Amino acid sequence: LMKTGKFSLFLGGDHSVTIPLHRAFGRYSKEKGLKKIGVIHFDSHADICDTYDSHKWSHACTERRTVEDVITPGDLAYLGLHSYEIEELEYFDAHPEGLVIKAYDVFRDGYLACYKKLEERFKDYDAVYFTLDIDVVDPAFAPGTGTPEAGGLTSREILELTKLLLGNLPIKAMDIVEVSPPLDQENDITSWLALKIIYEVFGCLDR
């Protein structure tokens, strides 16, 4: 799909599905001669453990695999983090060149100010992959996920941030992961939010 050169949207699945997608994005970018590529990762969790439960391909290891052979740590940016493993905090201490925007930053500074940080970081990039874990959204708005964390973004914030990214940065591929209908409420609120995000994504592409 990426070899077509068209925007690609993938739906998971837990966050481990992003590992091969990032690698395909890296290979495609290299074949196209794109020099500057990056990843924007929206999530409650950093997913940058080397191993998790003795497993290196876990959903908690997605970005560790990515910085091994797709991008450098400085080409990775997070938004929405508010739950960490000790190993992940140690990684961030060792690699301050990455951009980390916490969920509290969005609450304190506003989503637009936080978007501006992403825009400043990636405005000169050739291609960016955007991965969106639905648990970045507070479980009041998106309870249907495997590892919900209180204190996340609102549904409006995630929609506006998605539109800003797709409308202004060179997003070449995207995924939405960790939506779990069996864990959702009877009104399917999480699935409806994921569907609304998809609507907004393709609305941006059509402009």
Segments the model singles out, each with a brief description of its role:
Residues L1-R207:
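Conserved alpha-helical scaffold segments that buttress catalytic/binding sites
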